[in-house]
Amino acid sequence: MLFLALGSPWAVELPLCGRRTALCAAAALRGPRASVSRASSSSGPSGPVAGWSTGPSGAARLLRRPGRAQIPVYWEGYVRFLNTPSDKSEDGRLIYTGNMARAVFGVKCFSYSTSLIGLTFLPYIFTQNNAISESVPLPIQIIFYGIMGSFTVITPVLLHFITKGYVIRLYHEATTDTYKAITYNAMLAETSTVFHQNDVKIPDAKHVFTTFYAKTKSLLVNPVLFPNREDYIHLMGYDKEEFILYMEETSEEKRHKDDK
């Protein structure tokens, strides 16, 4: 065996037989190229061992594999489990992700920063008020202070009112049929709203910034962004018997009106 590992010419004359000899020879050879060259230049008795022949030729075939690291068969499932992304968390299954989350966050940050800059310059403006009032007409002063006030106060409040119901992520817990909606609060921190499917109320009239009401809170989602359409149907309650009967009655009434 030592002669075979060192590539000695005496290894050719040694009889190699049995499974242990073939496996030890395969482990002793340092690389596929060395094993192939040594196996091609040697000959000896061989026999079938689990689909491979013993001897140097069998060892060469055992080592004739790609140079990358091989993962044992019994590890493949574990490695595949670690590398497989999961959409489940302690909050439930992730069924929706808003594509405007970064834009909402960036616009609100910009609005807050401009408000802070405006508030920083207000003391300086007030100190220079006497000099400005003498040279600038009163209407222009009113317009100027109105613009400053809108940037510092009105714009952040308006943006928060518009985007407070925008859902960043939505989770669903199937066992309890509850949902968890993640939104931004006034301080740009993520806040959660937990509600049951029975708490979902669809507004009678269409609202630009409201898709449904969860208890008393208005939430905004984009139906197109649901990877599974059934999740949106179940969220809105469109799979309930009451809604199906209502739609059938509505379609029948419309059909009768068209016939008349």
UniProtKB/Swiss-Prot annotation:
<keyword id="KW-0809">Transit peptide</keyword>
<dbReference type="GO" id="GO:0005654">
    <property type="term" value="C:nucleoplasm"/>
</dbReference>
<comment type="similarity">
    <text>Belongs to the TMEM70 family.</text>
</comment>
<dbReference type="GO" id="GO:0031966">
    <property type="term" value="C:mitochondrial membrane"/>
</dbReference>
<dbReference type="GO" id="GO:0030061">
    <property type="term" value="C:mitochondrial crista"/>
</dbReference>
<dbReference type="GO" id="GO:0140260">
    <property type="term" value="F:mitochondrial proton-transporting ATP synthase complex binding"/>
</dbReference>
<feature type="transmembrane region" description="Helical">
    <location>
        <begin position="142"/>
        <end position="162"/>
    </location>
</feature>
<keyword id="KW-0472">Membrane</keyword>
<dbReference type="GO" id="GO:0005739">
    <property type="term" value="C:mitochondrion"/>
</dbReference>
<dbReference type="InterPro" id="IPR009724">
    <property type="entry name" value="TMEM70"/>
</dbReference>
<keyword id="KW-1133">Transmembrane helix</keyword>
<dbReference type="Pfam" id="PF06979">
    <property type="entry name" value="TMEM70"/>
</dbReference>
<keyword id="KW-0496">Mitochondrion</keyword>
<feature type="transmembrane region" description="Helical">
    <location>
        <begin position="103"/>
        <end position="123"/>
    </location>
</feature>
<feature type="topological domain" description="Mitochondrial intermembrane">
    <location>
        <begin position="124"/>
        <end position="141"/>
    </location>
</feature>
<feature type="transit peptide" description="Mitochondrion">
    <location>
        <begin position="1"/>
        <end position="81"/>
    </location>
</feature>
<feature type="topological domain" description="Mitochondrial matrix">
    <location>
        <begin position="163"/>
        <end position="260"/>
    </location>
</feature>
<comment type="subunit">
    <text>Homooligomer. Interacts (homooligomer form) with ATP5MC1; this interaction facilitates the oligomer formation of subunit c/ATP5MC1 (c-ring) and the c-ring membrane insertion and also protects ATP5MC1 against intramitochondrial proteolysis. Interacts with the core subunits TMEM126B, NDUFAF1, ECSIT and ACAD9 of the MCIA complex. Interacts with ATP5MC3, TMEM242 and TIMMDC1.</text>
</comment>
<dbReference type="InterPro" id="IPR045325">
    <property type="entry name" value="TMEM70/TMEM186/TMEM223"/>
</dbReference>
<feature type="topological domain" description="Mitochondrial matrix">
    <location>
        <begin position="82"/>
        <end position="102"/>
    </location>
</feature>
<keyword id="KW-1274">Primary mitochondrial disease</keyword>
<keyword id="KW-0812">Transmembrane</keyword>
<keyword id="KW-0999">Mitochondrion inner membrane</keyword>
<comment type="function">
    <text>Scaffold protein that participates in the c-ring assembly of mitochondrial ATP synthase (F(1)F(0) ATP synthase or complex V) by facilitating the membrane insertion and oligomer formation of the subunit c/ATP5MC1 through its interaction. Therefore, participates in the early stage of mitochondrial ATP synthase biogenesis and also protects subunit c/ATP5MC1 against intramitochondrial proteolysis. In addition, binds the mitochondrial proton-transporting ATP synthase complexes I and may play a role in the stability of its membrane-bound subassemblies.</text>
</comment>
<dbReference type="GO" id="GO:0051259">
    <property type="term" value="P:protein complex oligomerization"/>
</dbReference>
<dbReference type="GO" id="GO:0033615">
    <property type="term" value="P:mitochondrial proton-transporting ATP synthase complex assembly"/>
</dbReference>
<dbReference type="GO" id="GO:0051260">
    <property type="term" value="P:protein homooligomerization"/>
</dbReference>
<dbReference type="GO" id="GO:0032981">
    <property type="term" value="P:mitochondrial respiratory chain complex I assembly"/>
</dbReference>
<dbReference type="GO" id="GO:0005743">
    <property type="term" value="C:mitochondrial inner membrane"/>
</dbReference>
<protein>
    <recommendedName>
        <fullName>Transmembrane protein 70, mitochondrial</fullName>
    </recommendedName>
</protein>
